[in-house]
């Protein structure tokens, strides 16, 4: 799929995110929106997957380590055809299979339940090691938040991945600079992120704009050429990307839009869509 078409899909994913959160009246828009382009690139371009056979043995695996941004994952899964888009508005509702964090037992396309920060990357490392031991060809991708990497478990997993030279694993960090309590650098700075992963024998790819499809494509194309090292892609993004009043605002880490805010958010995204159609 061409980059422009991927951008259009990502904009639809953002609309789905906002719509689901508005219906839920709770959840995490900021980090879901910042990673919408990444979700789109993975599921529409990068990964070997089949929505009609979500458990096929040779599929690539994805683990959402920052599990609170499940609305982003659910939205791209729906757009990709894993389940009906209409189900997105049941997010967090009693009896819905789409709860606040991913559940691998109930949601088609989810490879790992996640939510407790730091555990997702550990699971992804285990999947990658399993593939190596079984001589399987699938690749494993995991997405972490920059606030999440304050968790010590992240670095235990990174140490193991680097030591085992798991070149079938790609660790992605959504570096949007904000977490629930404020700026990541003020709460407990993990910077420079790239140097830390390099210290654990990772091949590191810095992406200046993780909301740009061309830059994401270049990063993942490079990752596929790396042998004998795990790859970390550290992408700078905008928290709340696409919605004017949410962008770079820490208050939108974990708050759903009310009716007025929802209308404004959808108007913003409609304008983005119109601009993309004119290109």
Where in this protein do the model-derived segments appear?
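Thiamine diphosphate
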Residues: 109, 113-116, 121-225
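Glycine-rich beta-alpha junction loops
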Residues: 68-69, 73, 176-177, 236-240
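N-terminal capping segment at the start of a domain
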Residues: 9-26, 174-176
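Glycine/aspartate-rich loop-and-adjacent alpha/beta segment that forms the canonical ThDP
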Residues: 213-279
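Cofactor-binding active-site loop characterized by glycine-rich and histidine/acidic residues
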Residues: 17-20, 32-163
């Amino acid at each position: 799929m061409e980059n422009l078409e991927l951008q259009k899909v990502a904009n639809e994913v953002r609309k789905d995110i906002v719509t689901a959160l508005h219906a839920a009246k709770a959840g995490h828009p900021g980090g879901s929106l910042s990673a919408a382009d990444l979700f789109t690139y993975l599921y529409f371009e990068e990964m070997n997957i089949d929505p009609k056979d979500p458990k096929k043995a040779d599929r690539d695996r994805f683990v959402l380590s920052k599990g609170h941004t499940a609305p982003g994952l659910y939205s791209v899964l729906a757009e990709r055809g894993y389940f009906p888009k209409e189900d997105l508005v049941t997010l967090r509702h009693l009896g819905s299979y789409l709860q606040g964090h991913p559940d691998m037992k109930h949601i088609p396309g989810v490879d790992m339940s996640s939510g407790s920060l730091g555990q997702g990357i550990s699971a992804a490392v285990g999947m990658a090691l399993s593939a190596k031991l079984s001589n399987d060809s699938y690749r494993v991708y995991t997405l972490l938040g920059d606030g999440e990497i304050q968790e010590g478990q992240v670095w235990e997993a990174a140490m193991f991945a680097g030591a085992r030279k798991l070149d079938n694993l790609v660790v992605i960090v959504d570096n949007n600079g904000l977490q629930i309590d404020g700026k990541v650098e003020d709460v407990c700075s993990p910077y420079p992120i790239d140097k830390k992963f390099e210290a654990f024998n990772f091949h590191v790819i810095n992406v200046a704009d993780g909301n740009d499809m061309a830059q994401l494509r270049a990063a993942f194309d490079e990752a596929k050429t790396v042998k004998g090292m795990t790859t970390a892609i550290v992408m700078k993004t905008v928290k709340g990307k696409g919605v004017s009043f949410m962008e770079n605002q820490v208050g939108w880490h974990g708050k759903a839009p009310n009716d007025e805010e929802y209308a404004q958010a959808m108007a913003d995204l409609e304008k983005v869509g119109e601009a993309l159609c004119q290109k």
